[in-house]
């Protein structure tokens, strides 16, 4: 049974005056205007004042006031707050206090005096925040073409449910993608057969038998089922998506597909990580945030 997705009422918007930050502000404006039926929407515009810049409070407030004005003039309830500290830490701590439905942050910040969202901050927020995080890349563009990624996990399902209820501009073009592993799935039986052989005795034909072909077909059928179930979640919200099954390295295939199809936003699941796990190499979501040329929405699977 599907659990109804909680509407996006409370948004925490990190602002520093950079072009990516301004694109984030305009995206939040679009979201709120697309969800005009929601009269409970509130946006907190958050800025971070570096510890060493305490005397420049007024300068750091300028982009926050501008963001507040831009939202308010479209009848969007927004308030600005500037807090001294370290960017990722302040944003995550404020999210814990506010419990927003969504954090919106620019992919990169100003690499100058007013820059707060420098490289790594967005990633740290994604990994430690308690809610979904929308990472916006400049230049600003309306979100019309959306790529939803599914791997069949609980985390992925949560992302799809969030995507199905996200306030997109009407008439958006949706794509639904699943990526099969780059090589056939090896069953425990096949692995045991290989590991018991010496290097000299290893027969390459072990990997081209009917048994292996059956595993390849089973993998493809499983992928088709993942796409079908994900598509059903979108159809339940009257979202029709083009489905695509690819094979290879997941992050590479997703990034290439997004580039080839001029995608504006990639949506994927992202497991919440503990402090010990926070720099786990090989994370698909991390690769997407670093290398995708479009904006990203990472929907968290809370830690147990």
Segments (PLM) and residue ranges:
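Structured loop/turn residues at secondary-structure junctions
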Residues: 16, 83, 138, 151-152, ...
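Structural beta-alpha unit
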Residues: 1-6, 20, 30, 36-42, ...
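Gly/Ser-rich helix-loop-strand patches that form or flank binding pockets
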Residues: 1-10, 88-140, 252, 256-304
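A generic structural signal for short
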Residues: 55-57, 79-80, 110-111, 151-152, ...
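Small/aliphatic-rich secondary-structure junction motif
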Residues: 2-59, 74-76, 145-210, 233-242, ...
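Short, conserved glycine- and acidic-residue-centered signature motifs
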Residues: 21, 60, 118-122, 156, ...
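Short, solvent-exposed loop/turn segments at secondary-structure boundaries
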Residues: 55-58, 70, 116, 278-279
């Amino acid at each position: 049974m599907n659990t109804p997705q909680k509407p996006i009422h409370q948004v925490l918007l990190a602002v520093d005056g950079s072009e990516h930050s301004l694109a984030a502000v305009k995206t939040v404006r679009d979201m709120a205007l697309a969800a005009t039926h929601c009269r409970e929407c509130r946006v907190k515009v958050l800025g971070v004042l570096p510890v060493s810049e305490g005397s420049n409070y007024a300068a750091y407030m300028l982009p926050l006031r501008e963001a507040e004005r831009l939202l308010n003039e479209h009848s969007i309830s927004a308030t600005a707050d500037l807090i001294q500290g370290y960017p990722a830490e302040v944003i995550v701590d404020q999210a814990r206090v506010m419990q927003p439905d969504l954090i919106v942050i620019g992919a990169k910040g100003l690499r100058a005096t007013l820059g707060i969202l420098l490289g790594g901050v967005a990633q740290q927020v994604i990994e430690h925040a308690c809610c979904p995080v929308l990472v916006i890349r400049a230049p600003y563009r309306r979100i019309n073409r959306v790529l939803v990624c599914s791997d069949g996990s609980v985390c992925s399902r949560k992302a799809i449910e969030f995507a199905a209820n996200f306030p997109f501009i009407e008439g958006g073009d949706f794509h639904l993608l699943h990526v099969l592993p780059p090589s056939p799935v090896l069953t425990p039986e096949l692995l045991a057969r290989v590991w018991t052989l010496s290097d000299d005795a290893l027969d390459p034909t072990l990997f081209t038998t009917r048994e292996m072909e059956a595993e390849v077909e089973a993998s493809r059928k499983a992928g088709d089922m993942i796409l079908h179930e994900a598509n059903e979640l979108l159809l339940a919200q009257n979202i029709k998506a083009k489905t695509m099954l690819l094979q290879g390295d997941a992050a590479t295939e997703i990034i290439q597909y997004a580039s080839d199809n001029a995608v504006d936003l990639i949506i994927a699941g992202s497991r919440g990580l503990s402090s010990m796990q926070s720099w786990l190499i090989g994370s698909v979501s991390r690769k997407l945030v670093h290398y995708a040329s479009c904006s990203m929405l990472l929907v968290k699977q809370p830690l147990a």
